[in-house]
Amino acid sequence: MKMFKKSMSILLVIMMLASSFALCSFAADDVTVSLRIEGIDKCLFYGDVTVAADSTVLDVIKAADEAEESLTTTIVDSDYGSYLVDINGIVAGTYTDMMWDGWSYMVDGVAPDVGVSAYRVESDDVIVMYYGDPWNTGMQYPIINTEKLVDGEISFTSIDTVYDENWNAVTKECAVTGYVLTWGYNGKTVEITPDENGVCKIPYKYLTMGKHTVQIEKYAAKTDLPTVLRYAPDFSVEISFFDGIMAFFKMIFEAITSLFA
């Protein structure tokens, strides 16, 4: 009897290990990625999407479409692969005379040289689909600079492709100018415009300790298409306790100085 119980115990352990291995093998067949879809003037989707291994960016978009009722897509098949034409009624080639506007994408901050139907995703990839006209109207990809945030200054640069006198393409770090900054503080937001050099001066009263959401927007005058890639809805910067105290005293000093100006 003891031998039978011992054999049954060993068998149960083996079965449990086998089932655990099967579950792990099943989970390994799935990958989870982050997907953000930026329309013309707002974010249309932002969240994690789980798809089977060896899936493409297009598969990720299809999965998001199936899971999210507010998201609709139109995909057209061609000799060059499947092409994403329309997301939520924003149809490629309808906003500019030259019809160069359309949907583009980046993975981990890099624009792949293949279409969405050819790029194979990996776990933890960060995918951003966005609408614009990068080749004609232009598009910048802002990198935030907070080195002088304690002084109330914030600015953005972008690594842009420019052309020299011989029309050779070169990359160059350029200042982002002419945008509108939306700064979050204490559950509220304030819009701030930069100077001609692209530097925003944030009043000290908005430099409270803790996290502050940051959004940047800029649109072409003729087409209203975005010319900067917006940040994710939850993008933020944090002001430390020390910097918050410094900003508070600078605000007091500024107020006293203005009384004697």
Give the residues covered by each predicted segment:
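Sec-dependent N-terminal signal peptides
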Residues: 5-17
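Ubiquitin-like/PB1-type beta-grasp interaction modules and other compact soluble beta-rich domains
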Residues: 7, 19-261
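N-terminal secretory signal peptides that target proteins for export/translocation
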Residues: 1-3
